């Protein structure tokens, strides 16, 4: 049976666009990509390019960069730059306008891609499954809303990403999410970021850098330590440095109720009995975006928080339906979604050469202030998987901060190895340039680098990165899952 389309992609994010473009260009397939709007901003906020381009990585990195100038200006005095720092203040509106201009240009480039690519078409609306080979495009997420068109297809790719969710407490409708934070008219004077993940931590840095005079930023997290899943010592050091930067990190704390004050600000009740007023409360809690896709109509199985269940090749419980990216809740990173999209459509489905994305040793970054770069296992993960593990640790004050006046800004590097053969299992860094350094480290680790390879490499001086080549003595070990200062002599 001949169908109207070879492939329908739900979601025009990085992974979906990679898959759709490859199918159309490399394999000459007829492809339809469905998403809610073409250009960023209200009402849907997300558009061509997905979360990353519109309300994620790209605009957030621009805003973090802007926020870093607060410290650079303050620290420049030690290097001889004389100015009236008290009179300097950031202009939030200028930042947002500049950010919007960049995002607009990316949206336009994707529009041109659709216009210039034979066999690739964009369909605006909310896509949902009618059955395993039919996608309906509606006016809204409401399953009873008007149907704009119906797409008949051989294959379906679900690439709808993740989406902010609510707390589920009274008054949480008064809160904004990280999506709306990109479109605030003014920087809040009193800001609360709710969550302990990278989005909350990154936005805390942004709002701290752009807060009006006399303002403050709080970050509250229900757990003991922010950034669960990252290296423990890096998390502790970042928490300390955030505090030194003026951000109050409040752990084991969660809002239980939010009410509106007469002046429009938010009155927040916390689980420890305290109460506080904030101009804005931002929720940074995300879940896979699958709730409105009507996956049950095609028999597609989902798991915790609506994550689409897939095998190693990104195939769902239905043979002709695949899913990639955040909606599968595997490794929720844009480059991973792009790789998954290429593997699924370029090679597995239309290429006839099944290939799975390797989700191990994926380098990533947290653009906090200061930032984190990480790749591979934490020491706890390594200790569960290997009999003997060595942990190399170093922290130091980068050269510039001997003059800048910010000696609290330590650079931390931690290397985790399999002690039996020296293989580098994980590298974790905190400090300026850590995200740039970790990319090269990730390549080394993917090639199977050993700690001896690091030791035999001549470092670039003077840099923070050269410390990777100088860490020759383990700080401690793990043996049979337990931390020890030295290994048993019989090993």
Curated annotation (Swiss-Prot):
NCBIfam families: trypano_reduc. PROSITE patterns: PYRIDINE_REDOX_1. Transmembrane segments: none annotated. The keyword Disulfide bond applies. Its main location: cytoplasm. Its EC number is 1.8.1.12. It catalyses: trypanothione + NADP(+) = trypanothione disulfide + NADPH + H(+). Disulfide bonds join 52-57. FAD binds at residues 35-52. Its cofactor is FAD. The keyword Signal does not apply. The active site is at residue 461. Belongs to the class-I pyridine nucleotide-disulfide oxidoreductase family. This is Trypanothione reductase. InterPro entries: FAD/NAD-bd_sf (IPR036188), FAD/NAD-binding_dom (IPR023753), FAD/NAD-linked_Rdtase_dimer_sf (IPR016156), GSHR/TRXR-like (IPR046952), Pyr_nuc-diS_OxRdtase (IPR001100), Pyr_nucl-diS_OxRdtase_dimer (IPR004099), Pyr_OxRdtase_I_AS (IPR012999), Trypnth_redctse (IPR001864). It comes from the Eukaryota. Homodimer. The active site is a redox-active disulfide bond. Keywords: Cytoplasm, Disulfide bond, FAD, Flavoprotein, NADP, Oxidoreductase, Redox-active center. It is found in: Cytoplasm. It is an enzyme of class 1 (oxidoreductase). It comes from Leishmania donovani. Pfam families: Pyr_redox_2, Pyr_redox_dim. Binds 1 FAD per subunit. Trypanothione is the parasite analog of glutathione; this enzyme is the equivalent of glutathione reductase.
């Amino acid at each position: 049976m001949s169908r109207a389309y070879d492939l329908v992609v739900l979601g025009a994010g990085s992974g979906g666009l990679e898959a759709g473009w490859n199918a159309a260009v490399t394999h000459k397939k007829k492809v339809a990509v469905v998403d809610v709007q073409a250009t960023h901003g209200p009402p849907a906020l997300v558009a061509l390019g997905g979360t990353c381009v519109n309300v994620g990585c790209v605009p957030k990195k621009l805003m973090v960069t802007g926020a870093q100038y607060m410290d650079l200006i303050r620290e420049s005095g030690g290097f001889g730059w004389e100015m009236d720092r008290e009179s300097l203040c950031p202009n939030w509106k200028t930042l947002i306008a500049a950010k919007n201009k960049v995002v607009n240009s990316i949206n336009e480039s994707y529009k041109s891609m659709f216009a210039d690519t034979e066999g690739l078409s964009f369909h605006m609306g909310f896509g949902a499954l009618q059955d395993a080979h039919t996608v309906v495009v509606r006016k809204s997420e409401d399953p009873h809303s008007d149907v704009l068109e119906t797409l008949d297809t051989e294959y379906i790719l679900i690439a709808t990403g993740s989406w902010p969710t609510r707390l589920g407490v009274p008054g949480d409708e008064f809160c904004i999410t990280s999506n709306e934070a990109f479109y605030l008219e003014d920087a809040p004077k009193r800001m609360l970021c709710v969550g302990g993940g990278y989005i909350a931590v990154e936005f805390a840095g942004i709002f701290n850098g752009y807060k009006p005079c006399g303002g403050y930023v709080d970050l509250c997290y229900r757990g003991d330590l922010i950034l669960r899943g990252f290296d423990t010592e890096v998390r502790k050091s970042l928490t300390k440095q955030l505090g030194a930067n003026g951000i109050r990190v409040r752990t084991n704390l969660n809002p239980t109720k939010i009410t509106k004050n007469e002046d429009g600000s938010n009155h927040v009740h916390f689980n420890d009995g305290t109460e506080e007023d904030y101009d804005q409360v931002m929720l940074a809690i995300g879940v896979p975006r699958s709730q409105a896709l009507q996956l049950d109509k095609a028999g597609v199985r989902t798991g915790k928080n609506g994550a689409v269940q897939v095998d190693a090749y990104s195939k769902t419980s239905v043979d002709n339906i695949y899913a990639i990216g955040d909606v599968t809740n595997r490794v929720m990173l844009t480059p991973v979604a792009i790789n998954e999209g290429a593997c699924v459509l370029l090679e597995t489905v239309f290429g006839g050469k099944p290939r799975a994305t390797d989700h191990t040793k994926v380098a990533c970054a947290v653009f906090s202030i200061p930032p984190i770069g990480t790749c591979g296992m934490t020491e706890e993960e390594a200790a569960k998987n290997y009999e003997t593990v060595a942990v190399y640790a170093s922290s130091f004050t980068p050269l510039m901060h001997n003059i800048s006046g910010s000696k609290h800004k330590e650079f931390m590097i931690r290397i985790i190895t399999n002690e039996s053969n020296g293989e580098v299992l994980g590298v974790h860094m905190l400090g300026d340039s850590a995200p740039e350094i970790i990319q090269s480290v990730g390549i080394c680790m993917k090639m199977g680098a050993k700690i001896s390879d690091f030791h035999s490499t001549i470092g670039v001086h003077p840099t923070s990165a050269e410390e990777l080549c100088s860490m020759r003595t383990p700080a401690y070990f793990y043996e049979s899952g337990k931390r020890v200062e030295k290994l048993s002599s019989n090993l």
